[in-house]
Amino acid sequence: MEELCKQPPPPPPLPPPPSSPSVAIEDPLPNGKGGGAVVVPSIAKLPEEELLGSVTMHNCPGTRASARVIQKMKQDQTRPMTPPPSEREPNKKEEKAAQKTPSQLKTGSGKTTWTNVERNCFFDALNEFGKDFEAVANCINAKLKRRNANSDYSFKTKDQVRQHYYQTYHKICKYVRFSEELKKPAQELYTLINYGEMRRKLQFLTEKHFMKLKQLVYQGQITVRCKGKNIRIKTPSCKALRRLNQLDDSLEDIRLPSKVEVLVTPANMEAFGRVQSLAQNPRGRIIVPLHKKLISFIKTFEYKWRSANQRLHEEKSAIFPSSLPSTATNNNNNNNETEPMQPSVASLDPSMCFQPRPGVAIHRPLLSITAYLSSISICLTAYEERMGFKVRSETLGNLAGMPVAASKRLRTESGSEKRSPETKKPKPSASPPLEKTLDDGPLEGNLMKMENSSGDELAEEIHEFLGDILEAMPHPQAVTIPALSTTTGDTTTVAVALETSHDPVLQAYPASADLSHAMVTSVIQTTCAAAPAPSTLVSGSLTAPSVARSKRKEAKEAAAAAQARNFKPLLSDDILKRIRKGWTQANAADITIGDLYVVFGQDSKLELEYYWCEVDSSTAMASSILTINTVAPSSSSVATQTGTSASNAIQTSASSNCYVSATSTSSTSLPYNPNDCDSVERVRAVTTSSVSNKLKHLLLVANLSERVRKRQCNCGHTCDRKRDLMTKAQQLAEATATGVVDGNFRTPMLPVRRPISNIDPVRQLSALTRQKINRQVLVQRRLLPPTSVGDRPYDLLSVRQLHSGLFEPIDRVDGTSSGGISSSGSKPDSSMGATAASQDQEPGDQRALDFLNDEATQASNRDMPNLDICVATSRTDVSGSLNEAVQDESTNQSFFHGSMSPMHLLRDSTSNARWLEDNINDFSLTSLLGHLDEIDATRDILDPSSSMSIISESSVDFRHKFQEIAALLQQQEKD
């Protein structure tokens, strides 16, 4: 400062104050000497006092005056306006810091801080506006201002929002890997929005939670274990993601009411008179919520308007519950809602059908609510599929340094955590199925794909529907359904079922998962009109598959051409017809009232018409089947049968006849696929047979359907089915009548489901002896012709060493062979082989055959014999192939004479009958012998001959038999 003050040079004439001792500046000296000379120059230099700034001079005579600086105002005025170059650089930073933006009320520091409330507002605004930083900043400031106007929140600018956006993304982007085809804004939005949702649901985010962020982005939902609870996190269906997926066009305009008013009116005068005869109003009005099930709605009106006969039937069933059969027609168990007011008795009334009022506009729904509200349809995988990306982000491999997830999480200590963001990689099959929205393609595109499905899928649907009907019968296990291979266009149209969404919210259009009862009725009526002739069967079996394929191909081409001509029609004609036809309990499935309102409802009203379906012929046939007890079959197809198994077989054939005619077409091929049959001769025999052999056709069809398709029961798993011996007996009769000659190998047959209560207790012994099938020693006994004398001993056995007892070729039998198997017939010449062979043996060898019975013969075969069924077969050619007789053990006659048969002993004795009932679970040889010994207690136990006779008459002692056989062979070798 002193240097600045010395800038103007001081004048030299000014004397210093100590050099002027005389103070006579203002007045001259009193003596007047020399005073004037001193005063004159001092007065001339008075204006120089301003050089020291503000100077106050006190001119007192005789005293010394001192100058003191009080203010430096003049000094500031003399300072230049531009500072020196050394001071210009630091001043620029100060000027920048001093600038203020209009939206910033407070001057913040260099680093912006975000509180938890501000972060929540940021993610809420991000879900709303996406990557629009200015709109996000305005939304944050508006929320903070509404929260508390007097708060000390620092309002955010656009740049601060952008900075926070990218900082957050770079922190979490390392946990997610995207496809190269996906654009950067989409990557950022999916990552940040899902992270914000996870941050909102979880209080604290750890490394383990970040590792699940990838699954949340890809699949749209995850389940996180936090504080002992499973928290489910879903991708929010926010506006930003809907706009990114192009799904936000019409969502805001849709407002569905919580309840709708349903107006029901009769469709015809018959329905009008039916309701009016009950003294009720045919026109009704009911207010129901949107989530009300349509099947519950139909059941309510069916119960309200049931006929007088149905009411009497219900009262009778309440009074006499045992006199009425169980429910046979109410097989609709697919609904979740049950009506407590409806009794569980068979309905005598026809089913009630509801349809849209004629003339109402059935339009394509403007939106698919499930697509908007479902997190699955808006996840990243769905977006990539919608955009048609070739490489999906979910299919990419693990990041570098990230191990693959194990099947189960390894148990670690509580303090340790996983450091890898990808230790639990989701399986490809774990991702839920994606739902396509209406914007992806027209609605009819998916429906055409479903309608053009293969015939096998159609056959599966028809099997499921007809299986539900047959399961209500008394013997559902004995009824089988043939597999369909070719169907006509009408049947294909009828059998198509729309896919139903698994999401509980409203669906876009009414969907059906089951076949309509009315639809199947029409199919049955059309197919049962005429029976095909044999020539038609022959030609149809050869040309039907190719014709059906060509028809399906032409239908596909025609549908594609029509779809190309009509640019995105509202609804296809097939869907319109299906909707116009209406819904019953059989095909209502999971449709709700809200589904119908979205399609053809308006102004909170839904107009429906009702009518009663005609009673179909299948119900009458089923009731006739229930009343059949015993029917005498044709002698040429099945021989005489005993017991309740005969009636069961006839019921099987009758039911099969009914439903084969129902499912087969009237002018095309067989009701099964001939390609699935492994025997060409059987197919030829079936195609060339006449109407009299219908039963054999049905048995073959039943066998094929059981072989081709695995039926499932109501409980959802495939039950173990027991072998039906009657089916094999009937197949043998069929082969005998038609002259079919097969190879020398057995054809394994799948068992037919049978109720356990109908199985004879003796037959259950076969399950205990099947472990002896694979024995190396095969014992074969020659059969005694029925014309021989009763006391004649059994023929000689031939022992053969076989590697397999199932598929060993069986030698043909001629007149002089001794190693084959002879079948006994009703004619005398059929026993020539056995008689000639028996004459070649020594008389002494026949004494060991007294200890043998029929059980030894059947031990080498697959199954135990059907002891209570004896089928008489007639064979004229003895030298022919007898593999059918070997294949079916149950067809052999009972060759026991007198008291030699163990079944004779078991049936004649009351104690043994009681043993069968009491020891139904204990079929041991010891218990059987114990009871048989009690029959004749007067025998001498010490007598060996009596013991041997007891064993030979009433038991199966294989060890003793084999010892006798070995002794017999040794004796033969010695001789």
Curated annotation (Swiss-Prot):
<keyword id="KW-0804">Transcription</keyword>
<feature type="compositionally biased region" description="Polar residues">
    <location>
        <begin position="100"/>
        <end position="111"/>
    </location>
</feature>
<comment type="function">
    <text>Polycomb group (Pc-G) genes are needed to maintain expression patterns of the homeotic selector genes of the Antennapedia (Antp-C) and Bithorax (Bx-C) complexes, and hence for the maintenance of segmental determination. Can act as a modifier of position effect variegation (PEV).</text>
</comment>
<keyword id="KW-0805">Transcription regulation</keyword>
<dbReference type="InterPro" id="IPR001005">
    <property type="entry name" value="SANT/Myb"/>
</dbReference>
<dbReference type="GO" id="GO:0003677">
    <property type="term" value="F:DNA binding"/>
</dbReference>
<keyword id="KW-0539">Nucleus</keyword>
<feature type="compositionally biased region" description="Low complexity">
    <location>
        <begin position="815"/>
        <end position="833"/>
    </location>
</feature>
<dbReference type="InterPro" id="IPR055315">
    <property type="entry name" value="Cramped-like"/>
</dbReference>
<feature type="region of interest" description="Disordered">
    <location>
        <begin position="318"/>
        <end position="346"/>
    </location>
</feature>
<feature type="compositionally biased region" description="Basic and acidic residues">
    <location>
        <begin position="410"/>
        <end position="425"/>
    </location>
</feature>
<keyword id="KW-0217">Developmental protein</keyword>
<dbReference type="GO" id="GO:0003682">
    <property type="term" value="F:chromatin binding"/>
</dbReference>
<dbReference type="GO" id="GO:0007379">
    <property type="term" value="P:segment specification"/>
</dbReference>
<feature type="compositionally biased region" description="Pro residues">
    <location>
        <begin position="7"/>
        <end position="20"/>
    </location>
</feature>
<dbReference type="InterPro" id="IPR017884">
    <property type="entry name" value="SANT_dom"/>
</dbReference>
<feature type="compositionally biased region" description="Basic and acidic residues">
    <location>
        <begin position="86"/>
        <end position="98"/>
    </location>
</feature>
<protein>
    <recommendedName>
        <fullName>Protein cramped</fullName>
    </recommendedName>
</protein>
<feature type="region of interest" description="Disordered">
    <location>
        <begin position="403"/>
        <end position="450"/>
    </location>
</feature>
<feature type="region of interest" description="Disordered">
    <location>
        <begin position="71"/>
        <end position="111"/>
    </location>
</feature>
<comment type="similarity">
    <text>Belongs to the cramped family.</text>
</comment>
<feature type="region of interest" description="Disordered">
    <location>
        <begin position="1"/>
        <end position="37"/>
    </location>
</feature>
<feature type="domain" description="SANT">
    <location>
        <begin position="109"/>
        <end position="173"/>
    </location>
</feature>
<dbReference type="GO" id="GO:0005634">
    <property type="term" value="C:nucleus"/>
</dbReference>
<feature type="region of interest" description="Disordered">
    <location>
        <begin position="809"/>
        <end position="844"/>
    </location>
</feature>
<keyword id="KW-0238">DNA-binding</keyword>
